[in-house]
């Protein structure tokens, strides 16, 4: 039993024993010896090498074994205890005499259970640790036969407390004494004459290992030590005597013992033998029926096996007694988790309720603030309108008076009334009428640009959202996209207006973008345009080059009544490196096209003059921002008001400052131009040089480069935020170069055609989210070096021009995304290449210039394809003024504000006189004819590469001049009507790709 009280690691008596997760019990100091809290929370058991984890501390992680503590307490307490139980046996001679003497001298002291204290002496008597001993009393010669129980056993303990009236350490006599006799097995194993035998210690936990013929005491007393429970083997209950505790133990009945000794499988026959190999009890029937099973097995008597295994049984009892403690700990943990979860649930409910209540209060405050702001803006706008009405009334009266007076003077003058005074008055009134005309134009333009548009439903209160300092700002729509609709005009062609940008200063000096709506079409009764004419012309150019699918941004929504386009196009030839058109993405207003849109607009100017009086009934739609192009169609952009059109989320209403960059991709590296600092800086290196690839910008921050002559199956991705290139593991299924790619504004990129024979007709779709390819229907004709556009309203793709077949014919094909079907629409009147092709995003595809495929000569005409009627219209009025040809070149002329007079039309696009006259008249063009001395020559470009709009007030043109060694980049301001040259001192060349990014 002593080995159970020793630590298996230090082999000493347990000191604060604790149980590890592997069920081994160690001293606390041994556990601390193998625990290194500074390095690891894992403890390695020195007995079995299994790991245990210390969560917080050793005391909280490993339970203390209380039963061992109790055993140690009773072993080392300061009461008189004996360490062992000695059983003296009668000698073979004189045993009867000794017994008689004992009975005569100490009738009450024979065969008693006593508590041995090894540190004291009782009346001079000496107690030995041998099984057979003879104790001599100094006062009496009698021999006492005693049974002493080792206090290490927690069950069978007899007590003789000091406070019961006996002398120093005297034994307490228990009534109803019963003589103790040993079983035959133990009696035979003892020696009557020798004391050199090892002590026989009784081991018992629940019951003493004594055969039924051994008498046990009916009662035994123990000291109540700090209310610690002690198991006592007794048939009776000990009552409180002089402060002693009464302890009751369960009594196993004889019937239960008899039931356990019978076999349940064979009619309750008694077990007769134990099979050590099978580790089970057997009756005679079990042994007879299963002879083969127990053949060659070792069989043993039940009594001998029980004697052999009593130690294991005791160990198993102790081990099993620990199981409830572990289960109780687990149960307590679960109960604690339930309690903690209830607290967390309560706190979470409270937090949710508080947050939602706070949100409701904030929404109510926001609602009241918006309503107050709307009322305030309404009153301000109403006062402004009243002031304008008074100004208009005054101007009308002045005009009427001057007109009537002038008419009278003209009548006198026509009646041949010749007078110097009359002539002077006539000229004076003529000057007054011109001044009044200019004043009327200025007033009308001011009303259209700054007043009227605010009262259209789409533009009610566009500046509701303000910063904390009260400065007006814009609402950013990061991912919202709109489709561009088309509304045909029944009266033919006309002129359209364009949004104007005005930079105003807020109260604190910070600039705020205040925008204007699209101008209404010019009618016969409207005054001739003045300073706004050039803006209108540029607006037409922008609108006719608008992207096929333009997502909204902060600048798009608040700064433009119509879609601001951005052009990115490369003209190409079979022997030149090209980049096919790229389409607009979310944060960058990007679009296919070239400066041919300007020439197209100018070439159509004379026709516009002839039809300028046919659109007097066209006006902006009250429910949308509308612009009227030169062909007489109204382009409607459905824009929702930020308050009434949709419920803004936190993401939608984020206020951000936007910056613009130009990304150029040369053969060597990425060149980045900051539009604020006006400085070029080098980016990352190009991973692999290639030509004839197509590039496109997605809705996030990635520019895809598909194919190319050197990399026909590769996809390279450039991250504009991280300035890194990545080689996409996904390959293009077919070889692609000299092809086109279009983006639907959502998630799909379409690759069309190419120079390779196997892929010249193929159409494949790339999903930028799943990175998977899908093969779609093929075109009717193979194409390369062509142009393609996506029509968002019809959900179709138009492809036209390029190298189609040997007979030098060119056609227009349309692909329906819903039907997955190609159809040939018509043929192009004049097949060409190296031409400027643009799509206005709604109705017309325009082709200008280029080289005739039949004779390789320059083409001087411009054609326009109507996507609604599928018909071509040739616009060839004054082609010489439209295209100034030197070699195979197209000259870019400054677009100024021409006067609507018979001797000056929109077709005269050379920069005659208007710049000087406009600057001398505060932006109002003079009336000079062809320009004369006021003519200002401009730079000339050939092979226009890229044109795009920055979304505010600048149009960028990228190309080459035959007299220059490097490419040219110009920035044209639609506000000041001036060109500004951006120096290029980097690796860009003519065929580099330029992409505009706004964030």
UniProtKB/Swiss-Prot annotation:
<dbReference type="Pfam" id="PF00097">
    <property type="entry name" value="zf-C3HC4"/>
</dbReference>
<keyword id="KW-0863">Zinc-finger</keyword>
<keyword id="KW-0479">Metal-binding</keyword>
<feature type="compositionally biased region" description="Low complexity">
    <location>
        <begin position="904"/>
        <end position="924"/>
    </location>
</feature>
<feature type="compositionally biased region" description="Low complexity">
    <location>
        <begin position="485"/>
        <end position="516"/>
    </location>
</feature>
<keyword id="KW-0175">Coiled coil</keyword>
<dbReference type="InterPro" id="IPR001841">
    <property type="entry name" value="Znf_RING"/>
</dbReference>
<dbReference type="InterPro" id="IPR018957">
    <property type="entry name" value="Znf_C3HC4_RING-type"/>
</dbReference>
<feature type="binding site">
    <location>
        <position position="286"/>
    </location>
    <ligand>
        <name>Zn(2+)</name>
    </ligand>
</feature>
<feature type="compositionally biased region" description="Polar residues">
    <location>
        <begin position="165"/>
        <end position="196"/>
    </location>
</feature>
<feature type="zinc finger region" description="RING-type">
    <location>
        <begin position="7"/>
        <end position="49"/>
    </location>
</feature>
<dbReference type="Pfam" id="PF24681">
    <property type="entry name" value="Kelch_KLHDC2_KLHL20_DRC7"/>
</dbReference>
<feature type="region of interest" description="Disordered">
    <location>
        <begin position="485"/>
        <end position="637"/>
    </location>
</feature>
<feature type="region of interest" description="Disordered">
    <location>
        <begin position="92"/>
        <end position="147"/>
    </location>
</feature>
<feature type="binding site">
    <location>
        <position position="263"/>
    </location>
    <ligand>
        <name>Zn(2+)</name>
    </ligand>
</feature>
<keyword id="KW-0862">Zinc</keyword>
<dbReference type="GO" id="GO:0008270">
    <property type="term" value="F:zinc ion binding"/>
</dbReference>
<dbReference type="InterPro" id="IPR013083">
    <property type="entry name" value="Znf_RING/FYVE/PHD"/>
</dbReference>
<feature type="compositionally biased region" description="Polar residues">
    <location>
        <begin position="552"/>
        <end position="612"/>
    </location>
</feature>
<dbReference type="Pfam" id="PF00643">
    <property type="entry name" value="zf-B_box"/>
</dbReference>
<feature type="repeat" description="Kelch 1">
    <location>
        <begin position="655"/>
        <end position="700"/>
    </location>
</feature>
<feature type="repeat" description="Kelch 5">
    <location>
        <begin position="844"/>
        <end position="892"/>
    </location>
</feature>
<feature type="compositionally biased region" description="Low complexity">
    <location>
        <begin position="613"/>
        <end position="635"/>
    </location>
</feature>
<keyword id="KW-0880">Kelch repeat</keyword>
<dbReference type="InterPro" id="IPR006652">
    <property type="entry name" value="Kelch_1"/>
</dbReference>
<feature type="repeat" description="Kelch 2">
    <location>
        <begin position="702"/>
        <end position="745"/>
    </location>
</feature>
<feature type="compositionally biased region" description="Low complexity">
    <location>
        <begin position="92"/>
        <end position="143"/>
    </location>
</feature>
<feature type="repeat" description="Kelch 4">
    <location>
        <begin position="796"/>
        <end position="842"/>
    </location>
</feature>
<protein>
    <recommendedName>
        <fullName>RING finger domain and kelch repeat-containing protein DDB_G0271372</fullName>
    </recommendedName>
</protein>
<feature type="zinc finger region" description="B box-type">
    <location>
        <begin position="258"/>
        <end position="302"/>
    </location>
</feature>
<feature type="repeat" description="Kelch 3">
    <location>
        <begin position="748"/>
        <end position="793"/>
    </location>
</feature>
<dbReference type="InterPro" id="IPR017907">
    <property type="entry name" value="Znf_RING_CS"/>
</dbReference>
<feature type="binding site">
    <location>
        <position position="266"/>
    </location>
    <ligand>
        <name>Zn(2+)</name>
    </ligand>
</feature>
<dbReference type="InterPro" id="IPR000315">
    <property type="entry name" value="Znf_B-box"/>
</dbReference>
<feature type="compositionally biased region" description="Low complexity">
    <location>
        <begin position="526"/>
        <end position="536"/>
    </location>
</feature>
<feature type="coiled-coil region">
    <location>
        <begin position="355"/>
        <end position="402"/>
    </location>
</feature>
<feature type="binding site">
    <location>
        <position position="294"/>
    </location>
    <ligand>
        <name>Zn(2+)</name>
    </ligand>
</feature>
<feature type="region of interest" description="Disordered">
    <location>
        <begin position="904"/>
        <end position="936"/>
    </location>
</feature>
<keyword id="KW-0677">Repeat</keyword>
<dbReference type="InterPro" id="IPR015915">
    <property type="entry name" value="Kelch-typ_b-propeller"/>
</dbReference>
<dbReference type="InterPro" id="IPR051746">
    <property type="entry name" value="Kelch_domain_containing_8"/>
</dbReference>
<feature type="region of interest" description="Disordered">
    <location>
        <begin position="159"/>
        <end position="209"/>
    </location>
</feature>
